Amino acid sequence: MSCPVIELTQQLIRRPSLSPDDAGCQALLIERLQAIGFTVERMDFADTQNFWAWRGQGETLAFAGHTDVVPPGDADRWINPPFEPTIRDGMLFGRGAADMKGSLAAMVVAAERFVAQHPNHTGRLAFLITSDEEASAHNGTVKVVEALMARNERLDYCLVGEPSSIEVVGDVVKNGRRGSLTCNLTIHGVQGHVAYPHLADNPVHRAAPFINELVAIEWDQGNEFFPATSMQIANIQAGTGSNNVIPGELFVQFNFRFSTELTDEMIKEQVLALLEKHQLRYTVDWWLSGQPFLTARGKLVDAVVNAVEHYNEIKPQLLTTGGTSDGRFIARMGAQVVELGPVNATIHKINECVNAADLQLLARMYQRIMEQLVA
């Protein structure tokens, strides 16, 4: 199958860009963008490669994505080596095919076609690309956004190419994401012998009523755009491994995926009040990895919906479900942010794959979005 989008996707897959190693992917993208008149600014931080590229001026539409991928797992379980792209029955296999090298290829090819047809486009077209989205994300998009904000860079619209679709490309568009807040909580007791409990203070016993009450809380009921806030215990650890020692500490890690009905401060206040109610001795550490954001119906959402309806003849669902994405950082710039990408059924899995025809369709959708906003 010969197609510019498929060929570029295959070139990217062949580069084993395990986060945060870019493995030459960005050099390939930069070469293509510079060839059509983009100015490229490399913005590397520590071990992470990033770039910000732009063409034109005025109202700005940026396409954002990441070149890094997660580890492939056991390569012997793949139907072909994970970094050797292979097409079988119309499906393109390879690590990163769906998440998200296919989207990157579709973006670049769409830009090439758009510039060829609109060499004097009235708005500014931009790219924000990082090599660290899948791992810590500490030196990726967030650092680029901070640098752009410090110099008052303009960003009106941003399309993130994360694999948003469920069954066919464009059936789901993400116009927001929930916030994510993690609590690392240590309950302090006194270690001792299980035969002499009066000489110890068991933190597991002390914390049990607190945990029961915590998991029973209905944090909110969500709203028109967001499901109800969810709290899940992710890790819980105590004890020495011996059956005759009362542990001295209990560690509990729990995560909130929260809607716009709550703030992270409201969650913290409620958890701390509950700890005090149960008279626990504790230390606590919070990690806020992202605030919730929502892009309401407007020029970007309308352009994305129009592109999907035009090429796939379906009306996409606008959802805020799922995990976090780099859109949470970009939203800080005041931009309208939407995610549109391929089907996500196999992302991070053995035999990750994407329908090759979907990538061609995605490039056409991306081009139509460009034409509506910055032509």
Swiss-Prot record:
Keywords: Amino-acid biosynthesis, Cobalt, Diaminopimelate biosynthesis, Hydrolase, Lysine biosynthesis, Metal-binding, Zinc. Binds 2 Zn(2+) or Co(2+) ions per subunit. Its EC number is 3.5.1.18. Zn(2+) 2 binds at residues 99, 134, 348. The active site is at 68, 133 (proton acceptor). GO terms for biological process: diaminopimelate biosynthetic process; L-arginine biosynthetic process; lysine biosynthetic process via diaminopimelate. Its cofactor is Zn(2+); Co(2+). HAMAP family: DapE. Belongs to the peptidase M20A family. DapE subfamily. This is Succinyl-diaminopimelate desuccinylase. It comes from Escherichia coli O6:K15:H31 (strain 536 / UPEC). The gene is dapE.
